[in-house]
Each structure stands twice: as structure tokens, then as C-alpha cells.
Amino acid sequence: SVGFKAGVKDYKLTYYTPDYETKDTDILAAFRVTPQPGVPPEEAGAAVAAESSTGTWTTVWTDGLTSLDRYKGRCYHIEPVAGEENQFIAYVAYPLDLFEEGSVTNMFTSIVGNVFGFKALRALRLEDLRIPNAYVKTFQGPPHGIQVERDKLNKYGRPLLGCTIKPKLGLSAKNYGRAVYECLRGGLDFTKDDENVNSQPFMRWRDRFLFCAEALYKAQAETGEIKGHYLNATAGTCEEMIKRAVFARELGVPIVMHDYLTGGFTANTSLAHYCRDNGLLLHIHRAMHAVIDRQKNHGMHFRVLAKALRLSGGDHIHSGTVVGKLEGEREITLGFVDLLRDDFVEKDRSRGIYFTQDWVSLPGVLPVASGGIHVWHMPALTEIFGDDSVLQFGGGTLGHPWGNAPGAVANRVALEACVQARNEGRDLASEGNQIIREASKWSPELAAACEVWKE
């Protein structure tokens, strides 16, 4: 076309391209779009593609200085959501050149930036992303990954056990260290700083790090097993965060922790790089995730946040428990658990996986099941999550009537019983309660725990 035609034109003329063949290098996104009444789905889908890539609300003459065809996002497919009125899944393809290499921050600023406040949409949710091989390869990913972690800890063939130290706020460093020691001495692999524990007036970070390290070495010497405590390095500035990680390294501990959403992806990626360079494992907590992922029609699904974390870097991440929830949620949760652990995951809509994802040998992340679980859940957890997971019992350890160490013993005995039963070919789903009962006959600690938390 000759000259430049000013004015507002429909997005769908430029950004809705149903004939587009997606490239292997494109980043693909699946959005759940709820248009305002009267807005056709094609226009809404095209608007999403435009606003999250090259588009603006009106035609600008500087468009003529670049090749939109090369840089624009394209809405290439739209399908109605079954059982929902006026909801659509819009598939958008983004050219790889729109994104800075190795930056989750930049990827999100584009894909889930301003577009979520867009007037023509009543609501918008990012359900899934396909990260192309070429982009995955620009990320370091998890500092160590599942296999290296097992080798460092010398623990194989079973899930790992953790416990969050409670009360989360108010303990002095010395008493906190004592609780850590008792749990590790009883048989847990890890204890954990609560995500809110950073460096408050009642317990400064350096004191906590010191007493936790002492507890850890004492428990290690007495049990002959390698122990860890997730020292929370999250801080108000990146510099302070790295300072804490450096001190953890100087103490010689195996693992530190970070709140990746409140801390931010830039801070998280910096910490992940430090951890790989210095041999520290990195435990990731997902505080704030529900702000983003809880609404069914707006925000982002957790599987997207999980993929982003695997790119940014973390060796463990909290990912829900599944136990006692609805069947459907179990499939969906297992979907993103596989996305965290496996090298290659096939598209499977029944599990909420919209795209086939190839991680091209990026290390895997251990999913952490945490929150409201106790010994009676152990068979189900072992069956659902398998060996490559961390099972975290906070109250389920510290709430034991005889104290922390017996609580830890109960959990370890229950876990070992479940793993042994599984290896003998028994069905944990149907025989779980019986397996726990049998084990509690020779473990008074487990028997007491079974009594407190009736099945």
C-alpha cells in the first residue's frame, strides 16, 4: 500500500492469522479469553496477540520502519471452552526475536504485561506456554537438578522428607536451631525456614544461619546421613540476598532457599547462578502464587509459573499436595509435576498440558508436597509423587504429642514402610492404611502419630 493510512483499525485484520504455520522457534501461548459482550472472539484473540507484542491502539507511521510480519505476535487458532459461556482459548505465536535471551523477566513483561488490563476483555488467563528449544538453551535452569542433588545427598530410591519449623515467627535463633536439630536427628532429610522468616527483630538472619548450621552438623554426625536446612536468603535487595547466600556457603551448608515470586525473577535467576557457581542447592517457595493463579478465568495457571521457575532456576519448588483434593485436580497437578521433572512432556489436554514441551536436557526440579499432610497421607503421597519429590510435614512433625524428634521418627518409619511395600509390589492406593498400621506395631512413635491424626 502506498503512503500511510492513519486511524484505528481492527486488530484482527493484522493479528488474526488462522493459516499461520507455527515455527519450531516460536514461543506459543494458550490464553483463556473472556471478551466483553459484543466483542467477537477473533477480535479479542487478535487484540491479545497485538497488545502483548508489536501492537498499539492506533496505526503509527513508525510501523513503516520495521517489518511487522517478522515481529508481530499472531493469534493462529481460537476454540470455545466446553461448558463455559463466552470463553475461548486463543492460541498466540510469538517470534523468538521479541524476547531477550535468558530473561524470564522480559518474557513475562511481554506476554503477561499490559495486555491483562485490556478494555475489550472481561478477563484473561494464560493457561500454558510452549518454550522453544532455542530459547530454553539460553537459560542455565536449576543450579543442580534431581540427579546431582541425589548424588550430593547420597539418598536414592525414595522421596526426601522435610519439615517447616514452627511457630514461624517469634522463636529465638538458639531455640530455632534446637527444633532443627531434633527433627533432623529423628530422621528427616531437611528442615525449612518458613517463607516469612527473613531477618526480623526477634531473630536476625546471621544468628539463625549459625545455629541452624550447628544443629545440622550435630545431627549429621550422630546419624551418619547428610542433612540440610533451607536457609532463607530472601531479602529486600539483591545485594543483601547474595550476602546471605555467601554466608551460607562459608558455613558449608548444602542448601539455601528463596521466595521466587515475591523476590522476583531477576533476583531468583541471580541467586540460581550463584548457587550453581558455588555448589549450593536452591529450594524455592511460591509465596504469592495464589494471587496470580487462583482465579479460574484471570491471571496465570501455576504450570506457567512452574515452567518459568525451571528456566530461572531452582532445585525444589512447592507444588501442592493433591491429597484429599478432587480427582481432576490430581491430574492437573501431576501434569505440572511432570513438567518440572521430566525432559520431555507430551501435549495432554486432560492434564491441562496444551503444548508438547521439550526441555532439551535442562535439569529437573523436585516438586515439594507441603501443607496439611500427616502420616496417614504417606501411602498416597508415595504413590502419586513417586521417588523424585520432597514431602514436607510441618505440623505433621512438630505436632507429635511426644515432640519433634519422635514426630520425625514417625514420618521416616511411615515413608520407609511405604517404599518397601511398593517395592514388594503391594498396591499403596488400596492397602495404604494397612501398611501404616502394620508399621506402627513396631514403632511406638508412629503409633502415637496415627492416634493423633486419625485417618
UniProtKB/Swiss-Prot annotation:
The active site is at K166, H285. GO terms for biological process: photorespiration; reductive pentose-phosphate cycle. Pfam families: RuBisCO_large, RuBisCO_large_N. CDD domains: RuBisCO_large_I. It comes from the Eukaryota. Binds 1 Mg(2+) ion per subunit. It catalyses: 2 (2R)-3-phosphoglycerate + 2 H(+) = D-ribulose 1,5-bisphosphate + CO2 + H2O; D-ribulose 1,5-bisphosphate + O2 = 2-phosphoglycolate + (2R)-3-phosphoglycerate + 2 H(+). GO terms for molecular function: magnesium ion binding; monooxygenase activity; ribulose-bisphosphate carboxylase activity. The keyword Plastid applies. Substrate binds at N114, T164, K168, R286, H318, S370. InterPro entries: RuBisCO, RuBisCo_large_chain_AS, RuBisCO_lsu_C, RuBisCO_lsu_C_sf, RuBisCO_lsu_fd_N, RuBisCO_lsu_N_sf, RuBisCO_lsuI. The modification N6-carboxylysine is found at K192. Mg(2+) binds at K192, D194, E195. It is found in: Plastid, Chloroplast. Keywords: Calvin cycle, Carbon dioxide fixation, Chloroplast, Disulfide bond, Lyase, Magnesium, Metal-binding, Methylation, Monooxygenase, Oxidoreductase, Photorespiration, Photosynthesis, Plastid. The record marks K325 as: Transition state stabilizer. Its EC number is 4.1.1.39. The disulfide bond which can form in the large chain dimeric partners within the hexadecamer appears to be associated with oxidative stress and protein turnover. Belongs to the RuBisCO large chain family. Type I subfamily. RuBisCO catalyzes two reactions: the carboxylation of D-ribulose 1,5-bisphosphate, the primary event in carbon dioxide fixation, as well as the oxidative fragmentation of the pentose substrate in the photorespiration process. Both reactions occur simultaneously and in competition at the same active site. Heterohexadecamer of 8 large chains and 8 small chains; disulfide-linked. The disulfide link is formed within the large subunit homodimers. The basic functional RuBisCO is composed of a large chain homodimer in a 'head-to-tail' conformation. In form I RuBisCO this homodimer is arranged in a barrel-like tetramer with the small subunits forming a tetrameric 'cap' on each end of the 'barrel'. This is Ribulose bisphosphate carboxylase large chain. It comes from Lupinus albus.
